[in-house]
Design a protein with these regions (language model features):
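Short gly/pro/ser/thr-enriched loop/turn and capping motifs at secondary-structure boundaries
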Residues: 24-25, 41-45, 124-131, 338-340
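Residues at the starts of beta-strands that form the adenosine-phosphate
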Residues: 14, 33, 117, 213, ...
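Conserved nucleotide-sugar donor-interacting segment of glycosyltransferase catalytic cores
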Residues: 72-151, 202-203
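Generic beta-sheet signal
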Residues: 18-20, 37-40, 119-122, 198, ...
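Short, well-ordered alpha-helical microsegments
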Residues: 23-25, 102-106, 319
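Donor-nucleotide binding loops and adjacent catalytic segments primarily
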Residues: 199-309
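Phosphate/nucleotide-donor binding subsite
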Residues: 33, 37-91, 151, 158, ...
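Nucleotide-activated sugar donor-binding and catalytic core shared by glycosyltransferases
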Residues: 1-16, 26-33, 86-89, 134, ...
């Protein structure tokens, strides 16, 4: 969202970012106005268990329901209040919301005459249901039998998710808003006046029931790094060996034993260069084999063009950036939106999904070697790369926003 805001600012728009206080320095460093969320909406995503301690032992559907009840649902009143306070202090021509920001629902469920246009920004896979595939991890199937299975799967999901739906509707009622007209995942995408999905169509399940208000704008890629001090080992990239990059991103990176450490060990005896981007200082003791290099930060726009395989827990931005360069992927992830991303990697053929957040060394090693040995994975990744070249996210987002500003 920060990258989107910077694009709009460079196009001449005055931007105010409303987000948690933990992002204050990043927003100000980007030259944008910052307003902090307040109350329980102002939590630190890096320490969710401190703010939402009951999530600690939950997994699977129970964890998803908990997130939507409490992380997203209970924060609606404070998020809504903050938006309205900004609107009361200054003219607001348009509101751009991240997809899980349910605090815009009270405005979206009210009269259009009482609010500016609201645009949703899809920085995770498209969440709304479709007749063409079942909820969560199933892939498209439009055969008669498949359509029936899809319907049954969607019904089962909505039934199991009903406690979260009821909870969110109760919170909305306290805000003076009517209940959601559709399931919450649908409402995220169809309630806004326009919804911009930040990837290309080649990296999303096709659907025959796509609303007209949803547009693909291509991936929002980081700005090219201006300066970068190459680490001492940088010339190793020219050794002729396969280059493997492993990362756990910047959120689910508290435990390197989930992916980074087992990847280093799985490939320790292979004739390849394995680079771990930790996303934070690696304060704990790590075992670093001779063929591995570890850095807390490396600009991916510099490194990914040299990479043969990306091993990741499936962050949307990282995966889209890799595919924009035609890099095939081995993905392991269950937290946040990452299981949905894994399903799309597998469906496109641009990589291998390990189907778990905690893969074994054997699983990782086998998958990496398979991707390196079979050119079809890189071919599919490069096909997505060609699709991405048809888009210019900054231009598309700017045009979409300006079309709604009166």
């Amino acid at each position: 969202m920060l990258a989107v805001a910077q694009h709009l600012s460079s196009a001449g728009h005055d931007i105010t970012i409303l987000t948690a206080g933990v992002f204050r320095e990043k927003v100000i460093a980007a030259g944008l106005d910052f307003v902090s969320l307040t109350g329980i909406a102002n939590y630190d995503y890096r320490h969710l268990e401190e703010f939402f301690p009951d999530k600690r032992n939950l997994r699977g559907m129970d964890l998803i329901i908990y997130y939507f009840k409490h992380t997203f649902g209970d924060t609606i009143p404070d998020q809504d209040r903050c938006i309205r306070q900004i609107m009361a202090k200054r003219p607001v021509d348009l509101i751009l919301v991240d997809v899980p920001y349910l605090g815009a629902f009270p405005l979206l469920l009210g009269s259009k005459n009482d609010r500016p246009p609201i645009v949703g920004c899809g920085v995770v896979p498209l969440l709304m249901r479709s007749a063409d595939f079942g909820r969560r991890f199933s892939q498209p199937d439009t055969t008669p039998e498949g359509l029936l299975r899809n319907k049954e799967a969607n019904c089962r999901f909505e039934a199991s998710f009903q406690p979260a739906t009821d909870h969110i509707n109760a919170v909305l009622a306290r805000c003076g808003a009517p209940p959601m007209p559709r399931p919450v995942f649908d409402c995220m995408c169809v309630l806004p006046d326009l919804f911009l999905q930040c990837t290309g169509e080649a990296f999303e399940f096709p659907r025959s029931d796509m609303p007209d208000t949803i547009r693909f704008v291509g991936p929002v890629l980081p700005k090219p790094s201006v300066s970068f001090d190459e680490p001492a080992w940088w010339s190793d990239l020219d050794s002729g060996r396969a280059v493997v990059l492993v990362t756990q991103g910047t959120i689910a990176n508290f435990n390197f034993d989930e992916l980074i450490q087992p990847t280093l060990m799985a490939l320790a005896d292979d004739d390849m260069l394995v680079i771990a981007a930790t996303g934070r200082p690696a304060t704990e003791l790590m075992v670093v084999p001779p063929n591995a290099r570890v850095e807390s930060f490396i600009p991916f726009d510099r490194l990914l063009p040299e990479v043969d395989v990306l091993v990741t827990n499936g962050g949307y931005g990282t995966v889209n950036q890799a595919l924009s360069l035609g890099v095939p992927i081995v993905v392991a992830g269950e937290t946040e939106d990452k299981a949905l991303i894994s399903a799309r990697v597998a469906w496109t053929g641009a990589g291998i999904s390990l189907g778990t957040q905690d893969p074994t060394q054997e699983q990782i090693g086998t998958a990496v070697r398979a991707v390196l040995a079979d050119s079809r994975y890189r071919d599919r990744a490069q096909a997505i790369q060609q699709n991405f070249k048809e888009y210019s996210a900054p231009d598309s987002i700017t045009r979409a926003v300006e079309s709604l500003i009166k």
